[in-house]
């Protein structure tokens, strides 16, 4: 449903139901081998604009689904994080309530800045200066056996995989808190991991000068995810 909600947020008329998308995807993946990892990208775009070609013309919508063979990342691959001078936007100045391509240039400059500092990704602040997410994924921290993740505040998307991790961890008996998280909280965490649809779980081994291990709860989060995925 997220792609249709995103289209509506961008004033684009969604034209394909979730059920129809699933049918198209199931037909498309028949062309791949069962051992291939297929990344699925449904997308809409406006074909015509109204006056000044800015506001999308309603009902005239392009749609496609991209199926791409992208191998799963090495489970031992870990990220390093640093801060960035760029922040997550707010609804008043961008479509933060949509999964939208127009948001990615901001993410790209976050990543580029982090890499010039010798890190693989950026830990990004919201408008208030608290932790929102990384440049590419949602963020979780672990402290004293409990799990914490930034509470959605309209500056980032609470991802599908993020929500699955929360459900899995709670069902497994862990306490999971959605709350305001500071950069100091991240520095003082026992474990840190990233959550995204492409990589599922990515351990974080450093935030600036602070180092972390790929700890037991990070590993358990990965196990729970794949147990859930294979159960279907």
Protein language model regions, located:
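Helix-start/capping segments and mature chain N-termini
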Residues: 1-27, 45, 51-232
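Ordered, amphipathic secondary-structure segments that act as subunit-interaction surfaces
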Residues: 18, 34-42
């Amino acid at each position: 449903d997220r792609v249709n909600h995103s289209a509506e947020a961008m004033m684009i008329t969604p034209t394909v139901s979730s059920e129809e998308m699933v049918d198209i995807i199931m037909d498309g993946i028949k062309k791949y081998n069962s051992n291939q990892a297929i990344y699925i990208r449904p997308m809409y775009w406006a074909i015509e604009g109204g006056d000044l070609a800015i506001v999308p013309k309603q009902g005239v919508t392009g749609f496609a689904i991209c199926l791409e063979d992208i191998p799963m990342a090495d489970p031992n691959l870990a990220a390093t994080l640093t801060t960035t001078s760029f922040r997550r936007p707010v609804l008043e100045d961008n479509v933060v309530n949509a999964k939208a391509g127009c948001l990615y240039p901001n993410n790209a400059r976050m990543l580029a800045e982090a890499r010039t500092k010798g890190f693989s990704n950026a830990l990004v602040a919201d408008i208030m200066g608290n932790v929102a997410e990384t440049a590419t994924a949602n963020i979780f921290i672990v402290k004293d056996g409990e799990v914490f993740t930034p509470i959605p505040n309209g500056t980032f998307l609470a991802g599908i995989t993020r929500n699955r991790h929360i459900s899995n961890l709670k069902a497994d008996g862990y306490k999971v808190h959605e709350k305001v998280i500071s950069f100091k909280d991240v520095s003082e965490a026992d474990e840190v991991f990233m959550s995204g649809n492409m990589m599922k779980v990515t351990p974080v081994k450093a935030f600036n000068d602070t180092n972390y291990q790929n700890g037991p709860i990070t590993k358990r989060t990965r196990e729970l995810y794949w147990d859930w995925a294979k159960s279907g």
